[in-house]
Amino acid sequence: MLIAVIGVNHRTAPLEVREKLAFTEWGMKDSLKRLMSYPGIDGCAIVSTCNRTEIYIAPMELDSGMSSVWSFLSEKSGLDISEIKNFTFCHTLYDAIRHLFRVVSGLDSMILGETQILGQVKKAYELALEAKTTNVVLNTLFQQAITTGKRVRTETGIDQNPVSIPYAAVELAKQGFGTLSGRSVLVVGAGEMSELTVVNLVANGVSSVIVSNRSYDRAVQLAEKFDGTAVKFDQLFQYMNRADIVISSTAAQHYVIKTSDMQKVMEQRVDQPIMMIDIAVPRDIDPEVRRIPNVKLYDVDHLQNVVDANLEERRRAAVQAEGIIEEELNEFMRWLSTRFVVPTITALKKMGEEIKQRELVRAYNRLGDLTEREKKIIGSLANSIVNQLLHNPVIKLKQYALTPEGHLYTELTQNIFNLQVEGQKPQTEIIPPEKKKKVAGGSTLNSGWDKGIAAMVADSRSRE
């Protein structure tokens, strides 16, 4: 059983191509079952997010399996296979496994170390399980990938340092207050950046959300998401008295919060400090506001400094994460190689047993009447020869199974001995000799085997 991945992401394709190759969660099961109907696909799972679509397969043969994926993507997107290949990447075996482990660890994301991808990979695996399109190889692969992603985050802390403006705003707020539990936030503006910031503030303990926006309806919509309060824009400064934190992100081309307005607010607060985070460009808050006592004002430059410092921390954590991935990768490869080698060893022993039984029958027929003791001795000799011949190959295969290249040695053994292994097919075939060499009497070279047995039988009879 082999492993391959064909995918597209933000580095390999523009958005208009990624859109055509994306899969919806509600239609995923049908898509998986459709892919399973293609030839050469023994198991499959699809990871599809806003920035990537990756199809993982466990085929009997790489060429046929990958060809089926190209056809499947062409059918789904309406694009020619040649066009799809221009925008996709393809990894097999060792590289495919490493790729998934890096993806789930956040090392292949647009934002290094981001946390969402772990849940997205887990969901992709769950959907494949529900669709019954996985097999033992994909099950083990995704289970170990999820374990790897969790281990990377636990041991390296790669996701602990925020590297986006909304996350950095929350980080600054936590630094200022120690804990955000029970704190209140006033949000000026109801756009995407405002919402992302509030999501993270609430997740970190903020209990009260007030939203003010020039469009009151937009303010209501955002406030309802957090069981908060919407206020009209002309009431902004009245409600600022209730806030510990102010987040401002409007599209205004002038200062929305002026120094004179904030002086009046702070006079009413009576030495109660307030943190103001301006994530708008151009700025919403007059920078002179920071001169007012008990006001802490941060803008995007302050936030970017936090982001840059945290990104450097994540890069250092990523180096440690790569080491963890290699450990998990080698462990999986040992398991996978064992999956390759066990059926091969079984087939090798079966071949030896079949040869032994066939040649024993020939020998018994040619030697005529034999006593049970003589048959037992001949059988014992045959067992000994077969066991000794196969001993080293079996031992070496088991040893190589513990290395990343174990499957290569296994396939080579299958080719050398022309083994028929259930669920596995050598990628290349050994061409058998056109004819066997003949010796005197018309027998094949196996006549030496017969003569050896005859000599042994004669010797045993002479001892009786």
Curated annotation (Swiss-Prot):
Sequence positions that bind NADP(+): G189, A190, G191, E192, M193, S194
GO BP term, example: protoporphyrinogen IX biosynthetic process from glutamate
Catalytic-site annotation from UniProt: C50 (nucleophile)
Alphabetical keyword list: NADP, Oxidoreductase, Porphyrin biosynthesis
E.C. code: 1.2.1.70
Binding site for substrate: T49, C50, N51, R52, S109, E114, T115, Q116, Q120
Pathway the protein contributes to: Porphyrin-containing compound metabolism; protoporphyrin-IX biosynthesis; 5-aminolevulinate from L-glutamyl-tRNA(Glu): step 1/2
Assembly and binders: Homodimer.
Family that this chain belongs to: Belongs to the glutamyl-tRNA reductase family.
Functional summary from the UniProt entry: Catalyzes the NADPH-dependent reduction of glutamyl-tRNA(Glu) to glutamate 1-semialdehyde (GSA).
Entry's free-text remark on domains: Possesses an unusual extended V-shaped dimeric structure with each monomer consisting of three distinct domains arranged along a curved 'spinal' alpha-helix. The N-terminal catalytic domain specifically recognizes the glutamate moiety of the substrate. The second domain is the NADPH-binding domain, and the third C-terminal domain is responsible for dimerization.
Name of the protein in question: Glutamyl-tRNA reductase
Organism of this sequence: Desulforamulus reducens (strain ATCC BAA-1160 / DSM 100696 / MI-1)
This protein's encoding gene: hemA
